[in-house]
Amino acid sequence: MEQCACVERELDKVLHKFLTYGQHCEQSLEELLHSVGQLRAELASAALQGTPLSATLSLVMSQCCRKIRDTVQKLASDHKDIHSSVSRVGKAIDRNFDSEICGVVSDAVWDSREKQQQILQMAIVEHLYQQGMLSVAEELCQESTLNVDLDFKQPFLELNRILEALHEQDLGPALEWAVSHRQRLLELNSSLEFKLHRLHFIRLLAGGPEKQLEALSYARHFQPFARLHQREIQVMMGSLVYLRLGLEKSPYCHLLDNSHWAEICETFTRDACSLLGLSVESPLSVSFASGCVALPVLMNIKAVIEQRQCTGVWSHKDELPIEIELGMKCWYHSVFACPILRQQTSDSNPPIKLICGHVISRDALNKLINGGKLKCPYCPMEQNPADGKRIIF
């Protein structure tokens, strides 16, 4: 963090100089334009009158030319000073950060350089599609000769089409999508469809008393959601009482908050990605964020290993010598290790919950069976092995 702070201080200085230079440059040029404009008007007036150029006007022209030359030289000098400040940022980065990080990961991690390049290009393309930068993704595919199937693109195209409509406060495409995927959204316990109907109802409320009948008619869409969202529906129906007086000055003014649009975009993105089998954040974003957390630790480990000359500790290409805590945000799958066999469970050897509540792996359960009965290794309870239930975390 200290290294980042040092670089940030240099960046702040550069940004301040950019701002100051821009303001000074704009002011100086405006003054020059004003002076030249006045001089031009005087010259035009003298030409119309047919009078020769006076000594005073000649002096003014000389002073104006000198002022232009001095201003240009001053701006050029200030511009050079900015270049030196930018160079200091680069030096601060070199001084505070280790530029050589290739040694942290062995080349043996990748099957080949071509495979490495292909995986990276695919990760970048997927990130661009997910961010809605479709034209950039297509351009990268053409330049890298990367073949991307239409089936891969289609979910991203649909997702971004609906998100663009939501950013323009158009609920139509999102509502159509939610209705067509209603059953699968219910299986996810999603409230997306209700939130979309609620937002449409709020838009009608914002239309004032003229939209009251239309809002009452639209409220019939809430009927399927009455059991799960009764309180929220009551609040919205109660707001109709204040419609003629104006919701802005009523206890229901929070309904008009623009944050509802940001919330609906987040909800749609999360639920749609879950439904389409996509992650909310692209693999590139997750890898980059994880790398920012893990890289300093890996650099320290590498330095210690080299200092103590114990390179054999880090010999596996798919395993680190120590566990690195990346934070809850990077936890995607719960992991259970069997306390009996001290092995991580898997699809072929899943965790099994016994009647007594203790959990062991299936392999451990099979090894503990004696005479058709199973005695829990942690308590005196004896039970039928068939009574064990598989657990899915």
From Swiss-Prot:
Modified residues (N-acetylmethionine): M1
EC code(s) of this entry: 2.3.2.27
Residues in CTLH domain copies: 155-212
Origin superkingdom: Eukaryota
An annotated GO cellular component: cytosol
GO molecular function, one term: ubiquitin protein ligase activity
SUBUNIT field: Identified in the CTLH complex that contains GID4, RANBP9 and/or RANBP10, MKLN1, MAEA, RMND5A (or alternatively its paralog RMND5B), GID8, ARMC8, WDR26 and YPEL5. Within this complex, MAEA, RMND5A (or alternatively its paralog RMND5B), GID8, WDR26, and RANBP9 and/or RANBP10 form the catalytic core, while GID4, MKLN1, ARMC8 and YPEL5 have ancillary roles.
Name of the protein this chain belongs to: E3 ubiquitin-protein transferase RMND5B
The species this protein was found in: Mus musculus
Lineage of source species: Eukaryota, Metazoa, Chordata, Craniata, Vertebrata
Name of the gene this protein is made from: Rmnd5b
